Amino acid sequence: MPTYNERENLPVAVERLTALPVADLHVLVVDDNSPDGTGEVADKLAADLPNVVSVLHRTEKDGLGRAYIAGITKALDEGADVVIQMDADLSHPAEVIPAMLEKLETSGAGVVLGSRYVPGGSTADEWKWHRKALSAWANFYVNLILRLGVKDATAGFKAWEADTLRAIDVASIKSNGYSFQVEMNYRTVKKGIAIAEVPIRFEERTKGASKMTLKVQLESAAMPWKLLFGRAV
């Protein structure tokens, strides 16, 4: 779970995760030296729940992709069988994780996406029409170019088999920001590994600020073409 300025949301996210009926669940917080003190909040949570929560402190904020690579690498090194990616801003519903794990076990897929766009999935009522249109267009755009065959190509809520993460060589991924999610999916499809989806309701954050900058949007627009022509893999 990568964090940057999420001191208000992180304790709630951890509380929801630790309440799940999931055996051997471990929460790894990857904090990018948040100036609002998120790292200190994470350390307090780890001290209170030493067998459940741990913290990886990074010295600088250099992108969502780099934070995920650091966290996934640490999780694999520590012997995780399944790695779950999720945001700390409470937009991803933790209560769906058991269903994602069941789907991962029964479907034969190497990764399960928490999907806004399969039947039963939805986005927050607070989303304005233009944001919904942009999200729908982004998914259409990515699938048109890369033929991923999934409904939510830009999803950031995922449950991965450890072997799948090793197969796609996460550490070598070059993209950053939200395009990191697309590149992970693309590498999975190129390896012939199945992707499954379960419906979620994506909620709007109520605390803190979005990290979706113009730079991130431009990178996300260019990345599918780079992947298609082999310049990013």
Regions found by a protein language model. Name each.
Residues M1-E15, N33:
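Active-site beta-to-alpha loop of glycosyltransferases that engages the nucleotide-sugar donor
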Residues E15-D24:
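Short, acidic, metal-binding catalytic loop of nucleotide-sugar glycosyltransferases
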Residues R58-D77, A94-Y178, R205-E219:
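Acceptor/aglycone-binding surface of glycosyltransferases and processive sugar-polymer synthases
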Residues G149, S172-N176, N185-R201:
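Catalytic donor-sugar/metal-binding loop of nucleotide-sugar-dependent glycosyltransferases
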Residues D31-E40, L90:
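A conserved acidic beta->alpha catalytic loop
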Residues A80-S91:
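Short beta-strand-to-loop acidic/aromatic patch adjacent to the donor-nucleotide binding site
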Residues D24-S34, L56-H57:
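Short beta-strand/loop segment that forms part of the nucleotide-sugar
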Residues E8-V12, D36-L45:
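Acidic helix N-cap motif at the loop->helix transition within catalytic regions
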